């Protein structure tokens, strides 16, 4: 069988990469698909990653986006028989690796290729939180009608995509999932490798569901510092003792508020337990919104793509608290937990 892999720098088995292990064992690996950040995981968020060849092995790296509607081209799809997926996700609707997997599942359904997911734990797999995506906001940072924190592994999510017929034209693909051993949704799994340049450690990964929304505002969330997604601030925020200055660094070449002294809040000293207890905490965004007093100039339209619904911005502008907003999506969370149950491979 001719094998293509969908993976990146996180596809490690011990200290060896899946690609090297397959080649050592004489498997016929003919192509690599790489997601956002590239196969070696060093490209900036949203940066264009072109097709190339893996320097170490000579296996061609194919673009996910060279065909129509953000799918691989027919020529790419004809090169292989089975797609092996091995990539570390962080379990959030706006983290793009799952959307790339879904596009590949769709292409495999169309061209009758098998898909095999080598499952990995979800470091945010112990809870479900956030509104279900209103599909009028479907985008590269929101591809499925799921909550912001869906609490599923990529294997479980793949099964759900097939079972709920979420692929375009209700297609399903020939899917097999190899589950993780000794894993439950309450297993706290610390990632051995940062999944992307701005999620360097577990603190960033745990705070990401609460701080990512700053991407849709003028506020810096610490890109270009040692604490991405763990701090927030802006040159015009007042009354804070903490400050930081974003710099140009690998993985954040041109971060928001580059070179400017930002005043704000450092969340990096919060305990993991406190972060888990709060789940998605909109109080940080609300705090910055009220402090900057920019009214309509605070949120860009990208905010709705991230949060997935139109009522959150409205409620923040009406002066509602984080708790009041969270109460509004409670039903979404309960509904989704019931809907996903048939697809769970691991104990909740």
Identify what each model region corresponds to.
Residues 28-38, 118:
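Short internal beta-strands
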Residues 89-101:
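Glycine/threonine-rich flexible loop motifs
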Residues 50-80:
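Glycine-rich oxoanion-binding loops at beta->alpha junctions
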Residues 1-27:
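N-terminal phosphate-binding or glycine-rich loops at protein starts, especially the Walker A/P-loop
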Residues 181-258:
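Glycine-rich, aromatic-lined ligand/substrate-binding cores of catalytic
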Residues 41-46, 116-138:
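Glycine-rich, charge-decorated loop segments at or immediately adjacent to ligand/cofactor-binding or catalytic sites
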Residues 137-210:
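Conserved anion/nucleotide-ligand pocket segment
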Residues 228, 232-330, 348:
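Conserved functional hotspot residues or short segments at active or partner-binding sites
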């Amino acid at each position: 069988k001719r094998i293509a892999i969908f993976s990146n720098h996180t596809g490690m088995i011990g200290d060896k990469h899946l690609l090297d292990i397959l080649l050592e064992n004489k498997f016929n690996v003919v192509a690599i698909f790489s997601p956002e950040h590239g196969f070696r995981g060093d490209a900036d968020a949203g940066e264009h990653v072109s097709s190339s060849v893996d320097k170490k092995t000579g296996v061609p790296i194919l673009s996910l986006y060279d065909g129509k509607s953000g799918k691989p081209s027919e020529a790419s799809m004809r090169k292989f028989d089975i797609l092996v997926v091995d990539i570390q996700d962080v379990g959030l609707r706006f983290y793009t690796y799952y959307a790339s997997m879904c596009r590949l599942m769709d292409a495999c359904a169309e061209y009758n290729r098998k898909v095999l997911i080598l499952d990995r734990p979800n470091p945010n797999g112990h809870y479900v939180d956030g509104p279900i995506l209103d599909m009028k906001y479907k985008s590269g940072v929101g591809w499925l009608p799921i909550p912001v924190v869906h609490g599923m592994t990529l294997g479980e999510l793949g099964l759900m995509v097939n079972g709920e017929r979420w692929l375009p034209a209700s297609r399903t693909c020939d899917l097999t999932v190899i589950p993780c051993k000794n894993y439950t949704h309450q297993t706290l799994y610390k990632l051995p490798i940062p999944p992307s340049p701005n999620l360097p450690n577990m603190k960033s990964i745990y705070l990401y569901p609460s701080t990512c929304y700053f991407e849709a505002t003028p506020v810096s969330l610490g890109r270009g510092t040692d604490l991405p997604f763990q701090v927030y601030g802006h040159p015009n925020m007042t009354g804070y003792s903490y400050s930081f200055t974003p710099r140009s660094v690998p993985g954040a070449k041109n971060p928001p508020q580059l070179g400017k002294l930002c005043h704000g809040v450092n969340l990096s000293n919060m305990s993991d337990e406190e972060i888990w207890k709060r789940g998605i905490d909109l109080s940080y965004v609300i705090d910055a919104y009220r402090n900057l007093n920019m009214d309509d100039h605070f949120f860009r339209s990208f905010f709705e793509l991230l949060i997935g619904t139109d009522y959150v911005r409205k409620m923040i502008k009406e002066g509602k608290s984080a708790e009041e907003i969270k109460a509004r999506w409670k039903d979404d969370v309960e509904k989704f937990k019931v809907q996903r149950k048939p697809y769970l491979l691991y104990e909740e």
